[in-house]
Amino acid sequence: MQRVRVSSQRAVVHKLGDSQMTLSPKFRVAASIQSTLFDRSSELELSLRGEPLIPGLPDDVALNCLLRVPVQSHVSSKSVCKRWHLLFGTKETFFAKRKEFGFKDPWLFVVGFSRCTGKIQWKVLDLRNLTWHEIPAMPCRDKVCPHGFRSVSMPREGTMFVCGGMVSDSDCPLDLVLKYDMVKNHWTVTNKMITARSFFASGVIDGMIYAAGGNAADLYELDCAEVLNPLDGNWRPVSNMVAHMASYDTAVLNGKLLVTEGWLWPFFVSPRGQVYDPRTDQWETMSMGLREGWTGTSVVIYDRLFIVSELERMKMKVYDPVTDSWETINGPELPEQICRPFAVNCYGNRVYVVGRNLHLAVGNIWQSENKFAVRWEVVESPERYADITPSNSQILFA
């Protein structure tokens, strides 16, 4: 049993960018399209000639307004004038300006696969305007199993990493690492992991990316772990796990990496779980109550660990570290439109649960009198996503 992450909404689907893909001997790497039209010197020349972005407004005020225009309106907006064409002509220019002005809106990136063709594809939901967009395909030569790889993100930097995985129809793990930059709408191939692995634990702690355990060739379980420094792109080993183990779900809580293998049929043995503290570079066994009650996909909200149950029509629950137990939170169960498998992520006090066909449930969580509660809203996906099953999801800001 493995886990994932995703999202949904009914709307026209737009291209997030116009990147072209070129083929190298092993990988397809995105190449940006450039034109003299989008040169900064052209923008400077037009502004010096006194052509305003919006007549009657200072440029800084006008730009502050235009940077709020939804992406789906860019095609029509760029035909207004040359300066608007420079701003809306490429998503790289637009998002670079938004970053410069400090805009940080959330976008939900969902990776799923077609139940008809098995093709892996990323879909992106603008969480402000609830519109769907697309990004270039990951530059992988081999056909990859949609569940074996792991993705992590640096939300505030607008970057995402996809690591490891497994070649479809084989037990061959991968050491591949891909990086996606939202501002550039661009995938790059980065330094490989030390150990090829699939179905492993991954998480980001203090800006460092950790990978632990998982499956090697022939589904042999690993105990080795490693960490990536995104600033220099280098992986280095860290302490081995207490036991060889693949990961069912992972969470980062209080600066520690929590890893559970989940319940395995026929449920004769309690699931194993381990906790890694990067400050001491030590692993320890997870408490019994935490690992035995971990029966779904986790999110961390209000510095507490919440679970969306493995089963449909179940209520969320939250872990109490004082009593080492789980308790159900108030509010309705997951809406009936959301069917397994689930892809789960969170932002602020909201949890995003994407189900089959990319229908999305948004849960608003709050605390009252020491008891948590949730209220659900459903966002239906476009009909064209009717054959997509979610595998993973991340949230980036741009």
From Swiss-Prot:
InterPro entries: F-box-like_dom_sf, F-box_dom, Kelch-typ_b-propeller, Kelch_1. SMART domains: FBOX, Kelch. Kelch repeats lie at residues 106-152, 159-207, 209-255, 257-304, 305-346. Residues 51-98 form the F-box domain. Disulfide bonds: none annotated. Pfam families: F-box, Kelch_1. Keywords: Kelch repeat, Repeat. It comes from the Eukaryota. GO terms for cellular component: chloroplast. PANTHER family: OS02G0202900 PROTEIN, OS07G0153400 PROTEIN. This is F-box/kelch-repeat protein At1g30090. It comes from Arabidopsis thaliana.
